[in-house]
Structure formats: structure tokens, C-alpha cells
Design a protein with these regions (language model features):
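N-terminal alpha-helical membrane-insertion module
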Residues: 1-77
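Long, non-transmembrane cytosolic or organellar matrix-exposed soluble domains/tails
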Residues: 194-254
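Alpha-helical repeat scaffolds
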Residues: 75-84, 110-123, 147-165, 185-199, ...
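N-terminal topogenic membrane-targeting module
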Residues: 50-125
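Residue signature of alpha-solenoid helical repeat architecture, marking inter-repeat boundaries
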Residues: 54, 86-93, 128-133, 165-170, ...
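Alpha-helical transmembrane segments and their immediate juxtamembrane interface regions
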Residues: 123-145
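Short coil/turn connectors between adjacent alpha-helices in alpha-solenoid helical repeat scaffolds
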Residues: 61-70, 104-111, 142-152, 177-187, ...
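"A position-specific structural signal for the A-helix of alpha-solenoid helical repeats
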Residues: 62, 92-103, 133-141, 169-180, ...
């Protein structure tokens, strides 16, 4: 299902629930004469409405997250960003900014990620939970765009992180050091070897860096096997393009 249809159905269900609740309230007013029972009926209808809306929003959010992250439906990503680009609420604006940063990161637009993440982090009212993710994307993008970055400079930057989530902070440091080894220092690093993830892009990312690690260890057969797992995916993804390039350079891409 595309995002436009999903959002249209979600809004239709909300309106339908509101209309149904109004009709039930009117019916209660006509049918029930006892004031106490009318009040009880009204409260019951409202409670049912709020419960339905809560479950509906939860289902809608879960479906969006599944299509965005678990299925990695890139057409859904594009529609989601396009149709929500003019949201008015500040909290929704920053949420869309983070979603845009995540999309740019997957596409290999690391300069855009750095620019937008820094813009977001400059906002004094930005909630810390968003700061954490913007900082993480920023640091990873810096490593992937600066071939002259020294390990000492990287470690200084990592020590200056203000990520308050200890799990994300530790993960960001380990990922950045692994990326440095694999893409700048060109030395093997086993960080990605035992990782797993429920989200598809992260799964593909793990495969890509496992392949890089195998290449640096001289295990070309394993590297080729891993890169071939990626080339069947959407070629607009940065890591798919890199996998295709590797196989072309090796003369093994069909």
C-alpha cells in the first residue's frame, strides 16, 4: 500500500468514527430519558471513541514504521516525505527533518545529512531525544565524507558527543570507529560480523560492511558472495551502488 492511500484511509476512519459517535450520542439522548443513564451512555460512547482512535493511531504508526523500516519501501519513503513536507506543528517538523536525514543517509547524500543535522542541532528548543539521533547521523556522515580524518581527531569528536542515551552513544562510537577502519584506514574490523537488526536497511548495511571487511582480509570469495546479496536491492541505495561498483571493478558484475 502506498502512503497516500494509507493516510487517506486513516483520515477516513477518524471522520467515520467521529460521525458514528455523534449519531450514538444523539440516539442516547432520544432513547434514554433518565439523566444518570444519559450521562453514563455519553461517557461510554466517548470512552469507546477515544479507545478506537488510540488503537487506530497505533495501527497507523506501526504500519508506517513497518513500510519505512522493516520493508524499506522506498516509494513509500518518498511519498511520506513529499506529503508531509509542509506540516505545521514544530514537533512534526523536526520529526520530518529527522526522516529526511535518514533518507539522505541511505541514498549516500552525506553532505546533505551533515548540513541538515547541523541545522537541526542549532535549534535551542530541540528535544534531547532528537539531538541524540541527529548527532549520531552527523558523526557517521563525517566519517564517510572526510578521507583525511585522522583517528585522533575522530576520537576527540566522539568524546565530545552529547548523546544522552548510553546505548546509542556507545553504538555510535563503535560504528564510527569501525567505519574509520574500513573506509579510511583500510584495515579490517570485525564490529559488523556479529550484528543483527530487524530493519532492512540496517541489515543491508551490515552485509555491506561485512563484505568490506572480507575484502580487507583478502577473502575475495566471501566478499563477492556478500556483495552479490546487495546488488538485487534498489540501486538508488548508496551501499547497493558501492556493491555494484566493486563487482564491476572485479569483473564479476552481470
Amino acid at each position: 500500500m502506498d502512503y497516500k492511500t494509507l493516510r487517506k484511509n486513516y483520515r477516513l476512519y477518524i471522520r467515520s468514527a467521529g460521525v458514528l459517535a455523534m449519531l450514538l450520542i444523539i440516539c442516547v439522548g432520544f432513547v434514554v430519558r433518565d439523566t444518570l443513564l444519559q450521562t453514563a451512555g455519553l461517557l461510554l460512547v466517548l470512552a469507546g471513541l477515544f479507545l478506537f482512535l488510540h488503537l487506530l493511531k497505533k495501527s497507523y504508526t506501526n504500519k508506517c514504521n513497518t513500510l519505512l523500516h522493516v520493508d524499506l519501501d522506498l516509494a513509500f519513503w518518498q511519498q511520506y516525505l513529499q506529503l508531509n513536507k509542509n506540516v505545521k506543528k514544530p514537533i512534526l517538523q523536526i520529526d520530518m527533518k529527522l526522516t529526511s536525514v535518514a533518507y539522505s543517509f541511505m541514498m549516500g547524500g552525506f553532505d546533505t545529512v551533515i548540513k541538515e543535522a547541523r541545522e537541526a542541532l542549532s535549534q535551542k528548543e530541540l528535544l534531547q531525544k532528537y539531538k541524540n539521533f541527529f548527532e549520531s547521523y552527523l558523526m557517521r556522515s563525517i566519517v564517510l565524507t572526510d578521507p583525511d580524518l585522522s583517528r585522533e581527531e575522530l576520537e576527540v569528536r566522539l568524546n565530545e558527543l552529547t548523546i544522552t542515551d548510553p546505548v546509542l552513544a556507545e553504538k555510535t562510537k563503535k560504528v564510527c570507529l569501525a567505519l574509520y577502519d574500513l573506509t579510511i584506514a583500510h584495515q579490517s574490523n570485525d564490529y559488523f560480523e556479529d550484528l543483527s537488526n530487524d530493519f532492512k536497511y540496517q541489515q543491508l548495511e551490515i552485509i555491506y560492511y561485512q563484505a568490506l571487511n572480507a575484502t580487507l582480509k583478502g577473502d575475495k570469495s566471501r566478499a563477492e558472495e556478500l556483495f552479490r546479496k546487495l546488488v538485487s536491492e534498489d540501486e538508488s541505495l548508496y551501499i547497493v551502488q558501492k556493491a555494484q561498483q566493486y563487482l564491476k571493478d572485479e569483473g564479476n558484475y552481470l
